[in-house]
Amino acid sequence: MRFLILFIFLITNVFANDVSEIKNIVIHKDAKTLNNVIFLDKKDHEINISNFDGNLIILNFWATWCEPCKEEMPSLDRLQVNSELVNLKVFPINIGKENKIKVNEFFEDFNIKNFEPYFDSPITLAKKFSLRGVPTSILINKNGEEFARIIGSIDFDDKKFISWLKTYN
């Protein structure tokens, strides 16, 4: 019986620590309350994340000139349609002050089809979240609170990342 309890304890700790192996992820000890998180769609309509309470949200800040953004965008696109994450909403928010034609060309060049581009104009969210660079992804739980941040690029296809993210879904 002791061996069974020890085995379960060890297995639980191994899986609980898997997320620590994912580079560039910062998990907040306490979730941060967010207010007035508003950005624009490609028709300049305002999108407020409070309209998506009850969903797991990823705000991905990026720019067309950013090489790491180019690397991660296809896997982020696939994450949006991952069948294990049915309540996930991904919002790629361009902060490069780039025109919409250039952003649309970027999406076409990288075959991004599962979400639309969004825009932070005039860079209000970049300031609000104190972004230090791109790409940066803000992870928001079902209560509308920031619980983690990805600073830099990651492979959104990573099985450990998806498994960890499912615990918030």
PLM regions: where:
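Structural microenvironment flanking redox-active thiols in thiol-disulfide oxidoreductases
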Residues: E71-F110, S121-K127
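Loop/turn elements at helix/coil->beta-strand transitions in domains of secreted/extracellular proteins
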Residues: G54-L56, V86-K89, N114
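Short active-site neighborhood of thiol/selenol oxidoreductases, capturing the structured segment around
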Residues: N48-K70
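Thiol/disulfide oxidoreductase modules built on the thioredoxin-like
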Residues: E108-K113, D120-W164
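Hydrophobic beta-strand anchors of alpha/beta hydrolase catalytic cores
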Residues: I58-L59, V90, S137
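Short loop/turn microsegments at loop-to-beta-strand junctions
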Residues: L34-N35, I57, V134-P135
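N-terminal "domain-start" segment that seeds a small globular fold
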Residues: N17-I49
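Sec-dependent N-terminal signal peptides
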Residues: F3-T12
